[in-house]
């Protein structure tokens, strides 16, 4: 396996792609991080290791705002545009000619959902999808992000902690939901994540 990192220019600054490529890959997966976290989140690393075991190369993507040292993400449209630029670059280089899978954790899962068809991905992985923001003491009630998941037409795996404060999405015609121990961090559910992802990869790759 080879591990490299390179910066990729996007309309909103430089992103960073951390590639972990297996020999004779069966597919390539691109994963994004959460809003306030990075590519070293435990669930992303567990997903990477499991993907390698199934012959899938993985690229972990740092959005431009994280590369620039900012903690708060920009508007969704900027995240989506930067993500599309990164995936396009990867498809012309590290993942050229491979069946493409995309995904991420939390905010990164939402970005992958919204852009899955635009980048031509064959399947989608959502770790800790933030379904409904926790209610605030004042202001309007939170809005569900379920329409983002429902708009996806490719096979989808959602891995969600049973105590996730954002809730648990329902399964759908092409959407499998694996509920594992733990909360939004998925730290207590890594074994379940690996099992669910391994089974799913055996079907979609």
Segment roles from a protein language model:
Residues 6-99, 111, 145, 179:
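Serine-hydrolase catalytic machinery in alpha/beta-hydrolase-like enzymes
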Residues 99-104, 127:
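Short beta-strand immediately N-terminal to the catalytic nucleophile in serine-hydrolase-like folds
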Residues 104-112:
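Gly/Ala-rich beta-loop-alpha elbow adjacent to hydrolase catalytic centers
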Residues 111-115, 135:
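Hydrolases whose catalytic domains are alpha/beta-hydrolase-1, hotdog thioesterase
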Residues 120-133:
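A conserved short beta-strand
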Residues 152, 158-160:
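Short beta-strand/loop motif that positions the catalytic acidic residue
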Residues 165-170:
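Conserved alpha/beta-hydrolase "acid-adjacent" motif
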Residues 182-195:
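Catalytic histidine-centered segment of alpha/beta-hydrolase-like enzymes
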């Amino acid at each position: 396996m080879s591990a490299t990192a390179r910066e990729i220019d996007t309309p909103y600054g430089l992103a960073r792609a951390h590639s972990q490529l297996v020999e004779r890959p069966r597919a390539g997966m691109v994963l994004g991080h959460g809003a306030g976290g990075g590519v070293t989140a435990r669930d992303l690393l567990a997903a990477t290791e499991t993907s390698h075991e199934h012959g899938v190369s993985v690229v972990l993507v740092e959005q431009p705002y994280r590369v620039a040292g900012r903690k708060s993400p920009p508007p969704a449209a900027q995240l989506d545009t930067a993500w599309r630029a990164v995936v396009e670059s990867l498809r012309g280089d590290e993942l050229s000619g491979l069946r493409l899978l995309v995904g991420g954790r939390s905010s990164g899962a939402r970005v992958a959902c919204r852009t899955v068809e635009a980048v031509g991905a064959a399947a989608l992985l959502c770790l800790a999808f933030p379904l409904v923001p926790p209610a605030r003491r004042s202001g309007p009630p939170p809005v569900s992000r379920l329409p983002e998941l429902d708009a996806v037409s490719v096979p989808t795996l959602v891995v969600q902690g049973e105590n996730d404060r954002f809730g648990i999405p329902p399964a759908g015609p092409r959407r499998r939901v694996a509920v594992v121990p733990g909360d939004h961090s998925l730290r207590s559910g890594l074994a379940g994540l690996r099992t669910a992802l391994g089974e799913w990869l055996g079907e979609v790759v």
